[in-house]
Design a protein with these regions (language model features):
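Residues that flank catalytic or metal-binding motifs in active/ligand-binding sites
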Residues: 35, 41, 78-80, 215
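Hydrophobic alpha-helical targeting segments used for export or membrane insertion
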Residues: 10-15
Length: 221
């Protein structure tokens, strides 16, 4: 008869226990028809904007999610995307599409609309220009880069990570004692933005960082 060491048996029991603890964690596929994007979400269903419940297609099991009932999801009335919250309301995840990133873009994204927006929000317009545009806005303002720069300007020293690419940007910062992660992608096909944003407490950082990476990497458009 084969004998097993106490160390091996302890490891086996702990592994088995862990598998039971995380057995219910699943990702499901959410498809947004309005903006034509797909993302894996940590819930099996969502409430739509007219009071109904929609079941989502299974994507995969995951040990990143403690239980399938940890989150609840709601689709906006205009069908642009989902708001996902944990049962305590400490974690908020947004995934949505939009044709505009800010009011300046809605109003034409010109020097005048930007100046007016900064004055309304009591932001230092001249300092912003000096820091990001060498004191003068270009004639053709890149809306994605502008929004990225404005976020960097607003959150300043609270920014922990930031990067920008050809059709996306990522920024992570601290706001009201919460970690905020935001990724914005421009879809050339739909001529719209796909926005992912998650905010959570530092105590949830260990599992939420991994959850965010999983969700962001699953976005297709």
């Amino acid at each position: 008869m084969k004998r097993f060491s106490l160390k091996f048996m302890l490891f086996f029991i702990l592994s088995l226990f862990s598998s039971f603890v995380y057995a219910d964690g699943v990702f499901s596929k959410y498809y947004n028809g309005r903006f034509n994007y797909v993302i894996n979400v940590p819930t099996t269903k969502y409430e739509n904007g007219v009071g109904g419940t929609v079941n989502l297609d299974f994507a995969k099991n995951s040990n990143l999610i403690p239980t399938k009932n940890l989150f609840r999801a709601y689709e906006a009335a205009n069908s642009d995307g989902l708001t996902i919250q944990d049962i305590n309301g400490n974690i908020i995840i947004l995934a949505y599409g939009s044709y505009f990133l800010n009011s300046e873009e809605v109003n034409g994204l010109s020097r005048e609309t930007i100046r007016n927006s900064f004055e309304y929000d009591r932001l230092n317009y001249n300092l912003f220009l000096k820091k990001f545009y060498n004191g003068n806005l270009p004639k053709n303002i890149d809306p994605l880069k502008y929004d990225y720069n404005k976020n960097l300007f607003i959150y300043g020293e609270n920014v922990a990570y930031n990067t920008i690419g050809k059709n996306f940007y990522v920024i992570s910062y601290i706001e009201e004692n919460k970690i905020v992660y935001k990724k914005v992608i421009y879809s050339k096909d739909s001529k719209a933005y796909i926005v992912f944003q998650a905010s959570y407490l530092p105590k949830d950082k260990k599992f939420m960082d991994k959850l965010v990476v999983e969700m962001v990497n699953s976005i297709r458009y």
